[in-house]
Amino acid sequence: MSKDSLTALVWFRQDLRTEDHIGLKKALDSGLKVIAYYTFNPRHYQNLSWGFKKTDRFRAHFLVQSVRELKESLKSMNISLIIDSKPPEIGIIEYLKKYQVRQIYLQHEWTEEEKKEEQAIAKKIDTSIKWYRHYDQFLFHPNDLVFSRDQIPEIFGIFRKKCE
């Protein structure tokens, strides 16, 4: 397989921007063809056990606008954005195969739902596909904290003073 036929995929989830996006920059630096993926995950639009949706109409409208802007921004970089409406552990698998994806770039998430999605995908794909996760959503990188995760203050003012 020639390097020209191999692809890097940037998986957009909560990080719908192109400026200062570490994963996107690293994918572009990889030398592989780059495509992007976003799904309007149907689970986000279902009623939760608390009786409301994780994503209701105002947030959905905002997401549609954000994804539209992301698509235009990526287009100006000559990158196609695949917009899907399947759960990622189903939808993304199809595109990994179709585009011979060898590298996946994504924001490192820590919540249970995102971790389960990643684990479900990892179980279904070729182990030669490399995952590149990055922290891109914090004021402070977790490795730069001067205390352990279980010692993080619950009040931001105290947290800030410990970090200064």
Region roles according to the model:
Residues 1-164:
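Trp/Phe/Arg-rich N-terminal binding region typifying the photolyase-homology
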